[in-house]
């Protein structure tokens, strides 16, 4: 799509995302009226929706304009109107249509697109004696699983001489409190990164991670990092890639943080390297490198079809 202008249309509620996108020199439009009106005002040759479940009315307006549409992570009522739906975070359909999904619905990790930074990153080699762990939860992390996880495992890491990396996203709601808390802990092996631009670098040299069940688990699998996964809500719980057969110790939905259970699983994986190695070996058989080309190829076919019509 190098010969096309690319615009990002962000909803009124996505000002943080809009500012991050604009900072990368992309043309950005903030929603002014109805979202479909703002999209059609750009007279696009193709629309790519990355907004989770699409409303049917929104999609009907786009299709009435005869514009090809590609949706990502869409299980909503509007998804059936898309020309292609890429649901990489779901291993199988969640809402079936007449018992069968159309072929234009692409499900599972074989369609997960790695960010380019991970293609250059150095994948981790298994170490029986772990030297570094990673704690990372996406989104705003309103329950502050980040701090609760840190308080659970920090004493265990301290007594074993294991370094800790804590990484939060730009929407993390407890940044100032966490900075003060980390300073009070006084652990020289503890590092905090807020809204890092190069996540792959934070994963290099990591032996075990504790995280939520979002897109990060795919990046962890690519980097060969066995992980303890805490789903933050029902939608994340449906991301079934983050299970034992792909190298993850899945703890279910954490409606109430269970420090004792987390501590037990953490100690098992830290102190029993053979258990961690089983998860590591399963991840080493997973490959995402060619997925982006498959997905982009489908998008380019839709663009070509639009030009020929």
Residue ranges and their predicted role:
Residues 288-309:
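C-terminal alpha-helical cap of glycosyltransferases
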Residues 81-144, 174-176:
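A nucleotide-sugar donor-handling region in carbohydrate enzymes
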Residues 217-264:
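Catalytic binding pocket for nucleotide-activated donors in carbohydrate/polymer assembly enzymes
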Residues 13-19, 176, 235-240:
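Short, glycine/polar-rich helix-capping loops at beta-to-alpha or helix-loop-helix junctions
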Residues 1-4, 8-101, 105:
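Active-site and donor-binding regions of nucleotide-sugar-utilizing enzymes
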Residues 14, 127-206:
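Donor-nucleotide binding loops and adjacent catalytic segments primarily
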Residues 204-215:
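Acidic donor-binding loop of glycosyltransferase active sites
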Residues 268, 274-289:
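A short, well-ordered alpha-helix in the C-terminal region of glycosyltransferases
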